[in-house]
């Protein structure tokens, strides 16, 4: 019989220890490392399912929001974008305007015009596919 209890599942904001100094990285994309700590990505192809909402020094709790198409969020922009542009991972936790099919991982769609350094409003979206070797 299927156990339908979901009492250990969380929706909304989460807190994890910072795996590196994230004190000035609010609004950046992040991922969990093997130790279960939040860290910035090391490249544009890494999957980053969180946006930092409260940075912290290494080892301290920081806040994050999981990316979901059910709601928009703000993330740091590198360069400029127009509303409707596809935003892709830059590889350092920021996003930039890009195209589908490039090497960078698509993250979502800009919902407003943005300038460099702005926390741009965007709608996360599952775009593209990932090939699993094996």
Give residue spans per PLM region.
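Glycine-anchored, exposed beta-strand/edge motif detector
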Residues: 1-134
């Amino acid at each position: 019989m299927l156990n339908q209890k979901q009492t250990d599942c969380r929706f909304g904001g989460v807190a994890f220890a910072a795996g590196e100094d994230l004190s000035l990285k609010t609004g950046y994309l992040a991922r969990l490392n093997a130790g279960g700590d939040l860290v910035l990505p090391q490249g544009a192809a890494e999957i980053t399912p969180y946006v930092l909402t409260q940075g912290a020094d290494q080892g301290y709790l920081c806040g994050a929001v999981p990316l979901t198409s059910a709601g928009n969020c703000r993330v740091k922009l590198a360069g400029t974008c127009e509303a409707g542009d596809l935003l892709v991972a830059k590889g350092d936790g920021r996003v930039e305007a890009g195209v589908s099919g490039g090497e960078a991982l698509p993250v979502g769609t800009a919902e407003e015009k943005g300038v460099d350094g702005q926390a741009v409003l965007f709608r996360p979206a599952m775009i593209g596919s990932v090939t699993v070797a094996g």
